[in-house]
Amino acid sequence: KGFRFLATWEAAFRNMTTKTALNSPADAKGMKLRTFPNEMMRWSLEAMGFTIQIMPLPEVFLAIQQGAVQGQENPIDTIYSNKFYEVAPNITLTNHVYSPIPLAISEKTWGRLSPVDQKAVTEAAQIAGKFSREMIAGNDDNQLKEMAAKGAKVNAKPDMAAFRQAVKPAYDKAREKYGADVDKVLAEAEAIRKTTK
């Protein structure tokens, strides 16, 4: 409220890096995984079998290195730039959460812009959003290749059917809290997933 949405920038899909191989929820059982504070994320990861640890991103590398957690989940670009593959070399491409970055401006600031400036800002935001999405898509492939060349093991085909089955209890919790809209979102996500196979 009080903000105007201008464009979607890209952080891409989130994936996992772990100390040991991760192919299915059976591998996740009891593994301590760092994530960010998000209720739906916590419910889903716990349903997969992980024990969740919330911690700030700058602490994650050392936490994995010292064994406080056995892995983490983030977009490929974050995995690469923070070198998580050095301490958790098993990269599992789960694409379990899409992380868009909304670009917004306060309505107060927007209202102070002339119509010409509003048009220019809107166009620039759209161009930058498109550039961001294209750049991340290209970066992911290159960064995965580079991490593999440095010793990371990339699992591009984990047992996603087992992961999808495992998270169903999290959807029940979401329905209890958020209502019937959860089923609408799940149906839309499934339709998109089927078109992108």
Stretches found by the model and what they are:
Residues 1-197:
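N-terminal secretory/targeting leader peptides
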